[in-house]
Amino acid sequence: MSITPADLSPASSSDHREKLQELLTAVRDLHDTALQELQAKIAKLKKERCLDAQKLSEFHSKNQHLREQQKIQQEKIRQLEDRLRSGPCDRCTVKEKQIKKTNTELEDNNQRNLSVISELEAERKTLTDENRRLSLELERLRRSGSPQNTSSEAEEGMIPDSPLRPLSLPVASKMKRRKEQNHVRYTETPLSLSHPESRQREQSVAFGCNGKGVLVAETCEMDATSVAERDNKRHFRIVVPETCRPDVYPEQVDDVDDDDLHIPSHTEQNQKPELRDCTNILIAGQNDDSPLILRCRPLASQDHQSSIDDVLRTPANSSTCVLTKGKRKHSNGAKKDREISDCRLDADETDIKGIIFASTPANGRLQSKNQETSEIETTQDSKKKCLDGHTPRKSLVQNHHAPFPYDQSWSVDPGADLGQYDTESSPQPEHQARTDLETLDTDCTFVSHSLLLRGQKTTGQSQTTGIGQKANDSLADIFDKTGYGEYESCPQDDSIDLKQDSVYEEEREEDDPEEKPEAAVVFRRPADRKPLVSDSDKSSRNKSFACVEVVRKKDERRKLKGHYCKECEVYYADLPEEEREKKLTSCSRHRYRYIPPSTPENFWEVGFPSTQTCVERGYIKEDEQPDVRIRRRRPYLAMFSPKAKSQKKKH
């Protein structure tokens, strides 16, 4: 830009000065404003710095104070550690010493108490032993002083020729046994018995009974034989209570009146468990024409001891030793107050029981010439030879090791209750007589119809033995029956209900198909509507079947509590507790609301169309679109049609 001289005129120069002056004033103003702003900022920063300095001083003072407190705490900790290292204080040491002293005193007292207790126990034991010894001595003195218990001394000690050792029982059990057996008396009715034997074997019996009888108590595993010969008319009898295979050697006794003989039997029921099965009363009778016959008879219970007697009935030309139970009195065959009759057992049932029941006439007298002996023998040939032989036995030495001719697997204690025994006993083989003696359960023996009726011959008349003929033999067959003329003390009830099972009936038909029933029996079951009559013909016999009727009606069933399942629990899980229990109780009866019937009406009638035709004609309506779910799901909504399933698959 070129400056012309015209421009350098004084007028133009004045203008330029004014403009420059204005610019300078403007710049000065701007500078002043900026400087003021900066000074204000500096003052503000100075104030903040002062405040920070004050805070810093405060923090420093606090820090110093905390450091001083920390030093004090560390000093205290050091002092406490020094005290712990130095040990407990004096007070603690004194307390510890006192505690140790009391503990030692308590231990010493306990030791002294234990020693005193041991001494007292030893003294008590010695006193009990002395008391037992004195009581045994007192009991022995009482028995030796009483004239009735002369044979009890032998029972307390060891019996000669007996494998059993003497057992020391407590005095309480002995006194209890004597108390229980105190009311039992055994009186023997003497009758003439021929027993020819010399007096040279009289010493074989260790405990003699004044020449009147022998009482052998609790002997086991021995042979029960007795030799009797003719041409010597002397009274001889052997009463053996609670024996199992006893061994009684022949002996010679004096010819003394036996009316005053009294031999009580004190049974020890709780002495050994092995002796509970060996409690038979063996009553031996000997005649002139037949060998010795051992007869077993189960005694009645203690409730009937005063009214039931045990009497032996012997064949012709023989005399019997009768063992009666009751008060001690003089009795003979002509003056008997009690009359006893028994159910006779047929000889055809000999393979069933092996037990001999003896019976007497109705008038109570021993009429041996007008009656025959009814005996039951076992099926074994060896046992039959011991009973069927009509010649007297040669000697005891030959038959010493022979087995007992009867099965001794069960017996009846004369002092025990008869209710725990059964009147039936199945035969046991000879080789099992010893092994089964310990393991056989003799409380109840079951004999089926086939076994009971196998050995019985077909007869035209009804034979009622009273034992083993029916599956449910009544209690009348167990007890004795006293008869006088047409009167019976324990008559048979002809109208008794026979609760026979169909299993017994089928078993009886299979095992014995040719056997005919003895009489037509009419019986009725509680559930039978009509009585069923069993005819004499087996082929036309009607079997009885129990009929069960509906007891509860529909209204009663609705009131019952229902059964619920896991699905119902899940289904009703969102309900409250009370409402859920209410729903679950009716769970088993709500399925009919959701499950449609499987078949329509008249489906099984002839001419009804098929299911597809019923669907096409509209007989069966299918719900293709079910209702909206009331809750989470409806598990019992069932769709049975395959057509609906195929349509759902297509969609």
UniProtKB/Swiss-Prot annotation:
One of its GO terms (molecular function) is endonuclease activity. Keywords: Cell cycle, Cell division, Chromosome, Coiled coil, DNA damage, DNA repair, DNA-binding, Endonuclease, Hydrolase, Meiosis, Mitosis, Nuclease, Nucleus, Phosphoprotein, Zinc. Residues 380-391, 525-539 have a biased composition (Basic and acidic residues). GO terms for biological process: cell division; DNA double-strand break processing involved in repair via single-strand annealing; meiotic cell cycle. It holds the Pfam family CtIP_N. Phosphorylation at Thr-599 and Thr-611 promote interaction with nbn and recruitment to double-strand breaks (DSBs). Residues 503-515 have a biased composition (Acidic residues). It comes from the Eukaryota. Residues 138-199, 363-433, 487-539 are annotated as: Disordered. Its EC number is 3.1.-.-. Endonuclease that cooperates with the MRE11-RAD50-NBN (MRN) complex in DNA-end resection, the first step of double-strand break (DSB) repair through the homologous recombination (HR) pathway. Functions downstream of the MRN complex and ATM, promotes ATR activation and its recruitment to DSBs in the S/G2 phase facilitating the generation of ssDNA. PANTHER family: DNA ENDONUCLEASE RBBP8, RETINOBLASTOMA BINDING PROTEIN 8. Homotetramer; formed by antiparallel association of helical extensions protruding from the N-termini of two parallel coiled-coil dimers. Interacts with the MRN complex; the interaction links DNA sensing to resection. Interacts with samhd1. Belongs to the COM1/SAE2/CtIP family. Binds one Zn(2+) atom per dimer. Zn(2+)-binding is not required for homotetramerization. This is DNA endonuclease RBBP8. The gene is rbbp8.
